[in-house]
From Swiss-Prot:
Signal sequence range: none
Native source organism of the sequence: Xanthomonas axonopodis pv. citri (strain 306)
PANTHER family: ADENYLATE CYCLASE-ASSOCIATED CAP C-TERMINAL DOMAIN-CONTAINING PROTEIN (PTHR33747:SF1), UPF0225 PROTEIN SCO1677 (PTHR33747)
SUPFAM superfamilies: NTF2-like
Superkingdom of origin: Bacteria
Protein name: UPF0225 protein XAC4297
Length: 128
């Protein structure tokens, strides 16, 4: 988990956290669905439940979000496989995230996420 603004951003882009996902976690609007998805991945790495809930569309947002408070999950990396603009205010992002729980083997998770833009802000809708 990054501890200073100059640490590399967990999302995989070649920038430090302060110039990459940090501004979105502080309230700036993501310019597109892929950027929002990367910021959400970084929020999982940083265990930032407040950002995850705020960036989740109200129609599908859970009442609460329980993250790995014991710190057993180690996020290992993110690969965006494709981004699809499905309409003027909708998009989908397919990505692969890698993580490890405790001392176990690394796990690869592929997700096909849907996003919607409302009032100039992108929101995570759901995944399939």
């Amino acid at each position: 988990m990054p501890t200073t603004p100059t640490d590399p951003c967990p999302c995989g882009r070649p920038a430090d956290y302060a110039r990459c996902c940090g501004p979105y976690h502080a309230g700036a609007a993501a310019p597109d669905a892929e950027t929002l998805m990367r910021a959400r991945y970084s929020a999982y790495v940083r265990r930032d439940a407040a950002y995850l809930l705020a960036s989740w569309h109200p129609s599908t947002r859970p009442a609460a979000l329980s993250l790995d408070e014991g710190g057993r999950t180690t996020w290992l990396g993110l690969t965006v496989q494709r981004t699809l603009d499905t309409g003027p205010e909708t998009a989908e992002v397919v990505f692969l995230a890698r993580y490890r729980i405790g001392g176990g083997s690394a796990v690869r998770m592929t997700e096909h996420s849907r996003f919607v833009r409302e009032a100039g802000h992108w929101f995570y809708l759901d995944a399939r």
